[in-house]
């Protein structure tokens, strides 16, 4: 490893210790590299504004930073273990190409605020993707709720048959859930949308840095004012972002559970397209819903990332190297979470209900609640009506149909009044 920015003259570097210090940092930094380049370009512009760089030096730095980004995207520049991290790679490249102008780029900043701004930009991108995917999932669910509003589906509590429900109600539930998930991701994006660049190591610098310029140039909504808080917010903002992602993957886990049950032979309510299943290495008859099961497992990875960062934050104020580990947590958490969410819209759009199996699973006792409510409407005290319906639950379905039960369910949001227009109006505000 070369280009240690902090190495002091006459002090030897122990290779094993340095390897431990670096860990997999430079590999993880590939996620943040383009954001670090963009922030370096904005920082250079700010330095030119206060006379640290000449216009000619700024032009050279801007050109080389653009070329570095292009080379990285195209594979001509590889961020690997010869560098300690992405920050040293940028400075080494600029110094190699531009000499003293490259050596000036770090004036007024620390790797502390450098990684803060790069990860902050990265989190904004990821949260926007969570919001977009959540909105896409909600729209698929809304469309299917409208199309299948009257399709009877058994309703369960405690995984026991309970009442007659509908595909419309099932889809509307997931639609509202993912509308909320989109809102939460957007709200969290607004929280993290503050610029820490220019806070240096966490105590500011004796330069009149043009932080207003870097805030605008990098597209931040506001300046993160306090250098102390800039360091305190590292981990805190990552935690908030993972919580927003976790809100979506938690619902993903539950919808995957439903689909896993519904595709089993014991239920057989739903047919999955073949591309969402795999086979067994020994049992020729098997079609395994592995995609659904791995979706269900995704939330565990997100929750683990959240827990890792939460445990890292048992620290006093100021920067601590412990926080380096937060990078791996967010990369792995968002990597797993977004990969699963990306598959969900198409999966939901291609689910096929099996109406004969759905209807066969609706038994007489599932009308007992209807009988009790109807008696209460007729003037019988509900508790008495409940007892009578319980005693006659085996015959409660006589003369009744699933469609009739659904048509009578007129409370707002229930089967006869799904209020999809209300949900659609909420969805429209997401765009």
Swiss-Prot record:
Belongs to the lyase 1 family. Argininosuccinate lyase subfamily. Keywords: Amino-acid biosynthesis, Arginine biosynthesis, Cytoplasm, Lyase. It comes from Xanthomonas oryzae pv. oryzae (strain PXO99A). Pathway: Amino-acid biosynthesis; L-arginine biosynthesis; L-arginine from L-ornithine and carbamoyl phosphate: step 3/3. It comes from the Bacteria. It is found in: Cytoplasm. GO terms for biological process: arginine biosynthetic process via ornithine; L-arginine biosynthetic process. This is Argininosuccinate lyase. HAMAP family: Arg_succ_lyase (MF_00006). Its main location: cytoplasm. The gene is argH. One of its GO terms (molecular function) is argininosuccinate lyase activity. One of its GO terms (cellular component) is cytosol. Its EC number is 4.3.2.1. It holds the Pfam family Lyase_1. It catalyses: 2-(N(omega)-L-arginino)succinate = fumarate + L-arginine.
